[in-house]
């Protein structure tokens, strides 16, 4: 058995791609449109997984159903997690692009944000935690994460 991907349904594909690719930095690997099924699948990978030694690197599958649907309960899914090279730099980049940092990286190790569809995204500092510092140290939580 091997892990393949995590699928999340999105309400607006372009908005989701803006968040996951432009803001978070994931890279689109492949896309599949199904006319009969009326859906689009987009597979994304973290930059560190793009050149993985096998084609079995984990991916995030975005599923967009062409006919409008309302999805609720993003919180009951749990979260998707990514290891990041510099949690402070990424959180600042996200903040500068209008993304709410729901759980700031006060400890230099962990932060949470949400996708446009309400999916909780955990960001973990790769390796040892960074030294706690401002503005993150005194930044309060916003909403749920």
Map each language-model feature to its residues.
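Eukaryotic phosphotyrosine signaling hubs
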Residues: 3-5, 75-80
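Core segments of cupin and vicinal oxygen chelate
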Residues: 7-57
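Vicinal oxygen chelate
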Residues: 31, 82, 88-145
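Short, charged/polar surface micro-motifs in flexible loops or helix N-caps
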Residues: 47-51, 67-69, 87
């Amino acid at each position: 058995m091997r892990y393949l991907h995590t699928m999340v349904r999105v309400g607006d594909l372009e908005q989701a791609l803006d968040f996951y690719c432009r803001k978070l930095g994931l890279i689109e690997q492949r896309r599949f449109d199904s006319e009969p099924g009326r859906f689009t699948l987009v597979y994304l990978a973290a930059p560190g997984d793009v050149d993985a030694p096998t084609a079995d690197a984990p991916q995030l599958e975005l599923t967009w159903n062409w006919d409008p649907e309302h999805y609720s309960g993003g919180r009951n899914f749990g979260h998707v997690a990514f290891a990041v090279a510099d949690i402070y730099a990424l959180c600042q980049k996200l903040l500068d692009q209008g993304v709410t940092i729901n759980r700031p990286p006060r400890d230099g190790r962990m932060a949470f944000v949400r996708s446009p569809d309400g999916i909780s995204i955990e960001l973990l500092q790769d390796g040892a935690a960074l030294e706690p510092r401002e503005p993150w140290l005194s930044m309060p939580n916003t909403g749920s994460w």
